Amino acid sequence: MSSARTPLPTLNERDTEQPTLGHLDSKPSSKSNMLRGRNSATSADEQPHIGNYRLLKTIGKGNFAKVKLARHILTGKEVAVKIIDKTQLNSSSLQKLFREVRIMKVLNHPNIVKLFEVIETEKTLYLVMEYASGGEVFDYLVAHGRMKEKEARAKFRQIVSAVQYCHQKFIVHRDLKAENLLLDADMNIKIADFGFSNEFTFGNKLDTFCGSPPYAAPELFQGKKIDGPEVDVWSLGVILYTLVSGSLPFDGQNLKELRERVLRGKYRIPFYMSTDCENLLKKFLILNPSKRGTLEQIMKDRWMNVGHEDDELKPYVEPLPDYKDPRRTELMVSMGYTREEIQDSLVGQRYNEVMATYLLLGYKSSELEGDTITLKPRPSADLTNSSAPSPSHKVQRSVSANPKQRRSSDQAVPAIPTSNSYSKKTQSNNAENKRPEEETGRKASSTAKVPASPLPGLDRKKTTPAPSTNSVLSTSTNRSRNSPLLDRASLGQASIQNGKDSLTMPGSRASTASASAAVSAARPRQHQKSMSASVHPNKASGLPPTESNCEVPRPSTAPQRVPVASPSAHNISSSSGAPDRTNFPRGVSSRSTFHAGQLRQVRDQQNLPYGVTPASPSGHSQGRRGASGSIFSKFTSKFVRRNLNEPESKDRVETLRPHVVGSGGTDKDKEEFREAKPRSLRFTWSMKTTSSMEPNEMMREIRKVLDANSCQSELHERYMLLCVHGTPGHENFVQWEMEVCKLPRLSLNGVRFKRISGTSMAFKNIASKIANELKL
């Protein structure tokens, strides 16, 4: 085993020197042993391997990175593998990558995405991250609208707990937003994407503008230096408002308008928001950063602890690491690991295959199938993975409950070497399906309890939640006739694309258009009360000036913007009559997370409407619809970094390859294929098209409708079709999956839609048309 690596030095915000790579692995010869791929004699349709992970499919792409859904071969646990091409990163980008890595390695909180393993070659870095199967909070809001305050409180307590934990470790996130909040299989929060995070010291100011403009604190727009935590506190206020109201407190048709509204500090309070919640917001959204509450103070707030009077939210106390769990140790010994290397890897925080196996054995599976895991013996070719830093990663919802059937639709990854195939011998062990007390700090019974989500996935409603009834009306408050965001009809009309400026491709994320149009029709006109801040900053125009040595955009975030199979994000409403909302799209620079180095471009664009970017020849702006738009008036598309004037790259316009068992498959493979059954979806509320028809009949109906709409399709699995519509290279081109799934505990089947590539609007148009024409 190699010795512990020297930790990365603290990086200055302005420092742009080339970081040394020696800390990643001082022995280049060991790198070649870190990866084992497929034996050339294995079947052609077998998925490639990286280390102990079988790659299942691509779930995100960027200019310099890619994310693959993978399965840990030894334990069967699903993970996300982020593949970063180091040769494409400049020195500044490498610095931020290493800083992100260092930060992720010291964070052990149950509501923060966890790093498992790092594998490095000379040109490529493979990062194995925790997998959150529930998708983004953003997608949940898109599909369901605002949360009731009880649900919002459960989520927000977890968010505050995790962010306060970061602050007590002198780490500031700087990019908190609904898109960076994930949900696991039990609907618990997982904070992701620490690419803009940094270490702070009170008295040493940070001076870089970074973050997403709608969530950015006013002092960032003014170009002031910051301590750090106060900008996270402001962003948390925006998040709380978004959870409870379903809209952003500050928006505008362009960056200049947004900036003016943030600096004015005025926002609308919807009538249904409780007084306690309104009072809490006033502690977050204070223009003067020195007067904003600390998170320790926020934890004691009345609204935060409603229903938790005997369990007041307190700072999380990280439990002592558990490096000697006898159950996991014995399991690993039975796989072929020695007790000495297990202890050395854990105590030394190697982040190698040994540590990853130990951690994964302690993690609860996101699978629906049960409490058993199949363990395989360790491969004979020993691996020693480098203890390299690892960036944060956006984890994704599972796309397959059966690894035998999953075939990757894009198996091209950087530098996957070949190696001997794995042993076929396996042994089954009944293992607890819960997380034991372990070194990651994910112990539910620690000194400060981690806020739990009271909403198990199977109890989710399929329809959009009704308006909250816990309104506190004040007769002394002037009320507007506009609603912040309750027009649910538009939820079925827009779709989302996720990503970050100049890195994430449109195909890195699926889109959504799921909601019931009937809900908003029955709603009375909503009223609002207004609240304005008492501090009015100078009305300067534009964003703060930049210097030539400001930070440049980080390269490591694109793969993190890809909860591809979010249960709430990929199902199409059958209603398609509501108007499209595009005044606040996710795919434009005005909503992108960026560093100060990008401000020159931003200033050039700040007078453009949100729906138009200079890169988009076809972008057209719709008139601003006031405060009454749906969440799609804020979030209609994800960030797109590819210049839309450029044609689709070959990597994006993939030719669909059949992955069904054909003439090259064995008789056993063919038999397994014939006997395959629809997989069960954990979240019943993600099913929008349900039927009591037999799965085979549903597949025939789907193919019939696809043919009628000139859509090409190929059988990817027994009950999954890969579909294509439009002309490659054109805006109407879209690829998506249609899968027949079983609803747990019900005698019904449903159809799941998931976008693979193409614009969100193109996907929405064809998917809505198909959903409407299906006769199920």
Curated annotation (Swiss-Prot):
Cofactors (names): Mg(2+)
GO BP terms, alphabetized: establishment of cell polarity; establishment or maintenance of epithelial cell apical/basal polarity; intracellular signal transduction; neuron migration; positive regulation of neuron projection development; protein autophosphorylation; protein phosphorylation; regulation of axonogenesis
Record note on modification: Autophosphorylated. Phosphorylated at Thr-208 by STK11/LKB1 in complex with STE20-related adapter-alpha (STRADA) pseudo kinase and CAB39. Phosphorylation at Thr-208 by TAOK1 activates the kinase activity, leading to phosphorylation and detachment of MAPT/TAU from microtubules. Phosphorylation at Ser-212 by GSK3-beta (GSK3B) inhibits the kinase activity. Phosphorylation by CaMK1 promotes activity and is required to promote neurite outgrowth.
Family matches, as Gene3D superfamilies: DNA helicase RuvA subunit, C-terminal domain (1.10.8.10), Kinase associated domain 1, KA1 (3.30.310.80), Phosphorylase Kinase, domain 1 (3.30.200.20), Transferase(Phosphotransferase) domain 1 (1.10.510.10)
EC identifiers of the protein: 2.7.11.1, 2.7.11.26
Catalytic machinery residues: D175 (proton acceptor)
One GO MF term attached to the UniProt entry: protein serine kinase activity
Membrane topology: Peripheral membrane protein
Protein family (similarity comment): Belongs to the protein kinase superfamily. CAMK Ser/Thr protein kinase family. SNF1 subfamily.
Name the record gives this protein: Serine/threonine-protein kinase MARK2
Protein source organism: Mus musculus (Mouse)
Gene coding for it: Mark2
